């Protein structure tokens, strides 16, 4: 990760409006991963990541920051919901499965990168196998015949290779030997994922090396053989060693909905495993060793980012030890009408841009005017204030409602409007959403 914090924030700004403090915090944390790797080995072992707690209402960009960060980081990344886990001893997933899933994600990411690296060699090998199936070797009886045959075969082979690359042979059917995949689906109760993975690996290895002849069209066969050749060129043991190092040194875990496992004040109840989940998370965040399919993974240098709305609880309701392990606190602000206005226009592939592109597929043009966008932003803010504040997600509901009629009759409208776009202005927004926004009972159930 060689991007500077400023470059990371700039990239996040393309997709997320506002929340500068949160962007700066994650940008610094991400850059510190790179800085740490430049240190001498002795000092590097002592530098631990500063974990982050993001606090803010729902729909303001916490999860979106995590999603975009995953794409930027080019590092093993996993997003989990804290509510999915239970205390050890209860039915459900235990928190150690977070690291096992992160290890799987790292292996998958590195395998994809390695397959891209060997792709050209795999394509050449796959083409040769397809050509062998298309052009069986003729039998020869003398050396002179063999020389003439070789020259003729070489010319024919080059001609067929050219036709294969141009796609002229795609629909031709051939018989070819491919690996016989052994797929075993094992249904297991929650919490037994590790045993299930081991059993699946065992059955997969038992079937390794088995081959079977199949009749396929050239296009399908080429893809199957290319994947097979790429897998053969990838060194699995080396890949596992790299993945293990990537998890330990660069891994990032985003734990969403952390507030849902916080004990709410002095409220008692039957949900005994809430605090247990927090206590199980402690050693994971502090640093422990977890057994995974890659081997033993040390979690000392994995970066943890936790987030929660904290509507019904406060960060201080988390157990004190967990609070101490999330030293960087970032508060995300609730969205204003101006933020809603910017969200509708500024991000890369904004909501308005998406709807325009979707309707364009049917030949219908729609145009969002400035006053229409402003009115839409105001209604989103008003409905959030009057009912539940769900942040930017309110815009999805409003836009679906606003364009419902247009989406339903897009094909008919395209033929009547020709090239002239349907203009979405303030009057259009008021006529479709005004009454619903004013009537609190209706907006509570419909918007």
Curated annotation (Swiss-Prot):
UniProt-recorded name of the protein: ATP-dependent protease ATPase subunit HslU
Subcellular location(s) of the protein: Cytoplasm
Keyword Nucleotide-binding set for record: yes
Quaternary structure, from the entry: A double ring-shaped homohexamer of HslV is capped on each side by a ring-shaped HslU homohexamer. The assembly of the HslU/HslV complex is dependent on binding of ATP.
Similarity comment: Belongs to the ClpX chaperone family. HslU subfamily.
Top-rank taxon: Bacteria
Keyword Nucleotide-binding: yes
Entry GO terms, CC: HslUV protease complex
Free-text function comment from the UniProt entry: ATPase subunit of a proteasome-like degradation complex; this subunit has chaperone activity. The binding of ATP and its subsequent hydrolysis by HslU are essential for unfolding of protein substrates subsequently hydrolyzed by HslV. HslU recognizes the N-terminal part of its protein substrates and unfolds these before they are guided to HslV for hydrolysis.
Chief site of localization: cytoplasm
Sorted UniProt keywords: ATP-binding, Chaperone, Cytoplasm, Nucleotide-binding, Stress response
Residues reported in the UniProt entry to bind ATP: 17, 59-64, 256, 321, 393
PANTHER family: ATP-DEPENDENT CLP PROTEASE ATP-BINDING SUBUNIT CLPX-LIKE, MITOCHONDRIAL-RELATED, ATP-DEPENDENT PROTEASE ATPASE SUBUNIT HSLU
Chain ranges passing through the membrane: none
Classification via Pfam families: AAA, AAA_2
InterPro entries in alphabetical order: AAA+_ATPase (IPR003593), ATP-dep_Clp_protease_ClpX (IPR050052), ATPase_AAA_core (IPR003959), Clp_ATPase_C (IPR019489), HslU (IPR004491), P-loop_NTPase (IPR027417)
Record-linked NCBIfam families: hslU, PRK05201.1
GO terms of biological process kind: protein unfolding; proteolysis involved in protein catabolic process
GO MF entries: ATP binding; ATP hydrolysis activity; peptidase activity; proteasome-activating activity
Gene: hslU
